[in-house]
From Swiss-Prot:
Organism expressing this protein natively: Buchnera aphidicola subsp. Acyrthosiphon pisum (strain APS)
Entries under Gene3D superfamilies matching the protein: 3.30.70.260, 3.40.50.1360
Enzyme Commission number(s) of this protein: 5.3.1.6
Described function: Catalyzes the reversible conversion of ribose-5-phosphate to ribulose 5-phosphate.
Protein's pathway: Carbohydrate degradation; pentose phosphate pathway; D-ribose 5-phosphate from D-ribulose 5-phosphate (non-oxidative stage): step 1/1
The encoding gene: rpiA
Family named by the database record: Belongs to the ribose 5-phosphate isomerase family.
Main EC class the enzyme belongs to: isomerase
UniProt-recorded name of the protein: Ribose-5-phosphate isomerase A
Active site: 103
């Protein structure tokens, strides 16, 4: 079974966590596109969605789901998103699709974070997938130097401007054994908008698409 089929399995499984009449926080990426497709089948049961990217907004509207502005809400019941990597503590690297800042804002405002992935995204230590960082353009050379200091190899993501009007660098060759500490360190650097480490706000539930079906990891059971 190819990875796209496993992504689709996980995406459809997330519907079990959607309560009628709620507004759903929706992430970005290929796995989330499957989730939006699934969400469209129950669009009459939900109130609508808050989107983390322009691309997800377009797809949500295409499936007849009303999209609301996050600034009108103090919290959301649930946020569904994927991850580029996730460790045993349900901490993640996200931002391969470039929407990391908006994703982190919605995740932080949501009572429940459901992460949907295929089995290839599960790792013991974060860092094999390059770590995305959204930065203000004038900070590029400074942030490059700071990433080299911590042992990383930064690369500018060419031809990409985020929905916020900023740029992204991807940092290779990191072995992130303390994700919370690294998240705080990088976020504290002047010019950083946000780093694609979701460690302080980790997932509450992980749904992993496997050939044998859905593997569910619950934060309470994982402690």
């Amino acid at each position: 079974m190819n990875l796209n089929k496993l992504k689709k399995k996980a995406a459809w499984a997330a519907l079990d966590y959607i309560d009628p009449g709620t507004i759903i926080g929706v992430g970005t990426g290929t796995t989330i596109f499957y989730f939006i497709e699934a969400l469209g089948t129950i669009k009459n049961l939900i109130y609508g969605a808050v989107s983390s990217s322009n691309s997800s907004t377009v797809l949500l509207k295409k499936h007849g789901i009303e999209v609301f502005d996050l600034k009108n809400f103090s919290s959301l019941a649930i946020y569904v998103d994927s991850a580029d990597e996730i460790n045993n503590h349900m901490q993640m690297i996200k931002g391969g699709g470039g929407a990391l800042t908006r994703e982190k804002i919605i995740a932080s405002m949501s009572k429940k974070f459901v992460c949907i992935i295929d089995k290839s995204k599960k790792v013991d230590v974060l860092g094999t997938f390059p770590l995305p960082i959204e930065i203000i353009p004038m900070a590029l050379s400074y942030i490059f130097r700071e990433m080299i200091k911590i042992g990383g190899t930064p690369k500018y993501r060419k031809n990409v401007i985020t929905d916020n009007g900023n740029i992204i660098i991807d940092v290779y060759n990191l072995c992130i054994k303390d994700p919370i500490s690294m998240e705080k360190k990088i976020n504290s650097l002047p010019g950083v908008v946000t780093v694609g480490l979701f460690a302080s706000r980790s997932a509450d539930i992980v749904l992993i698409g496997t050939q044998k079906g859905i593997r569910t990891i619950n934060k309470k059971e994982n402690r």
